Structures are given as C-alpha cells and as structure tokens.
Amino acid sequence: RTQELLQHLQPSQARVLLRGTIGSSVNFIASSVFMQSDFTQLIIANDAEDAQYIQNDLQNLLEKKEILYLPASYKKAYSFSEQNNHHILLRAQTLNALLNAKKGGEIIVTFPDALQELLVRKEKLIENTLFLKTGEKIDIDFMLDLLIEYGFNRTDFVYEPGEFSIRGGIIDVFSFGNELPYRIELFDDEVESLRTFDPETQLSERKISELTIIPNINAHFTQETVSTLFEFLPEKTVIWFRDYAFFKELIEKQYDKALEEFEKIKSGKIKEHPFLNKTLNQLFIAPDELIKELDNCRMVELGNKSLFEDEIHLQTFSLQTINYNQTPKPS
C-alpha cells in the first residue's frame, strides 16, 4: 500500500485519509514512505508526550536515520517565564539539519505548541552562524562580543547550551546546535585545536577540525526576522496528522492562552519580563496564518473520518482514501 500512498501524494496539495490504522502502525507506514521515497515528513503529534513516543518508535525502526524533534522552547506551554535551553538546542539542531539536508528527505516530529512558535528566518540563521577551522585567525575580543550578541551568557564553567567561558587562550562554548560543548584553544590569535568536551567532567572528548556555533534562535526576534518551520521545509514535504480537526481546535485554544499571558505581561503584573517590549506576533503564528501555510502542503490524516470530507474542503481539495482495516490483536 505504500506505493498507492506515494502515488496519491504526488500533487502538491494532496489530501490522503488512512482509514482503519491502529496503534503505532502509522509509524511503520511513515518509515516505509521514508525508505521508498525522497519526501521529507513532518509528523504532528497531539502533544509533547505523544511526539516523544513517535520519535523513539521511528528511531527504533530506522536505526541509521536521525529522527529530528522540534519541541517547544518553554518549560510550560505558553508560559513565557522560563525557557528550556535544551529544547532551544534541539530546535536549533533541527533547523541546522534541514539547512544541510541531503537528498533522501528528513523526518521531523513535533506537536501544536512547538509548531506555533515562530523561528528565526532562514537567511538570518545562516548569516548569524559562525564557522571555525583549525589554523584560522580570530580576535578574542571580537569573539566575546559576537557570543554575547548571539544570546550566550558568560560563566566560569560551561555546563548548558548558551554558555561560554574564556580563560586565557581557551574559549569554551556550548553551541545551540551541538549535543556537547566545544573547546577552542588559541595560540596567539590562531585556532590551534578544536575539541568537544564533557560538561560534567570538563574533560576533552574528541578532536575535530571544524565547528559550527549556532546562536540562540529565540534571541533578538523582530517582526522582520521571524518565520515559520515551513520556510525550512523542501517542496516535497508531507504533513502527517492524527486528527486535523483536533489540531485546528487546539491551536485556537492555545493561542487564546498565549494572548492572556501576554496581557498579564503588558499590564505590568509580571515585573521586568524579557518579553515586555515584544508583541505576540513576534513569537507565535496566529491560527489562521498557520492553517494557510498548511493548505499549501501535502497532508495525510489518520482515522475513519476526515475534515476534508465536507463540501467546503472538497471544492478545493481532492481527498483520496486508503483502507487498512487493521484490527487489534487479542491480548
């Protein structure tokens, strides 16, 4: 049935309903699409827990392929009081992987909260990414200013993404695009060696010849520098939904929650908030705008009924249905 699905996905605004799938069988279907095509797949789970389960399941099915994960930046959904630096790192890694994607397609797993968050524009990310190689000359004061501009915090020792330290001719920096921090050793103004190191032991792990430092993708957003994930996706992308109607309802509710939170910030009830001078449309895409973005994509929906079966949608989209008729195995 994978070939039938791939055939239905050829039109740029394809709409396909997979009827009668159960449990995690959809992950087998998505992995089969990956193996038999060059489509990039964006799988939109219902929530963070569901997304992590899908990512782990796909990673087990496709051991040699890194399954990308786009989480939300905040520790609590739509509560802007505390960002999760590890999640910002994962978001940056996903964008970096999409920027450098080779032929064959990527698989990204996300959920509504995370998808609604705006991202730095593609050209802005490229422009603000620093590349270093051994043997290059750098000015340490310039590096210091640049890291601060990139949203990094100077500390005595580096433990988390977004931190850096300078001790003599050694610069430690935890990029928002790498699982381990980097140690840059200088001889005068020349990069003598580059290594990754363990933040727990502070001991060097692996020597490398070049590195990429990605900025805090949530820092210094203006209306002109933000975009959506769709800017990073190739034309041959398929969007997967467990329940598109539920998704539409959820993004409306969550956007209303975000508006309420922003009203508290603007009213001064939350003192000295970092987003005091920002607007909500610098951080989140409005539900109607997100739906417009999705309308231009290929979509696969699961379940026995599709939102695209109503008359209004059928005037615009041609819905194809594939029946799997799976039944639960007796326990």
Name the predicted role of every residue range.
Residues R1-S331:
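Conserved beta-alpha structural segments and adjacent helices that either
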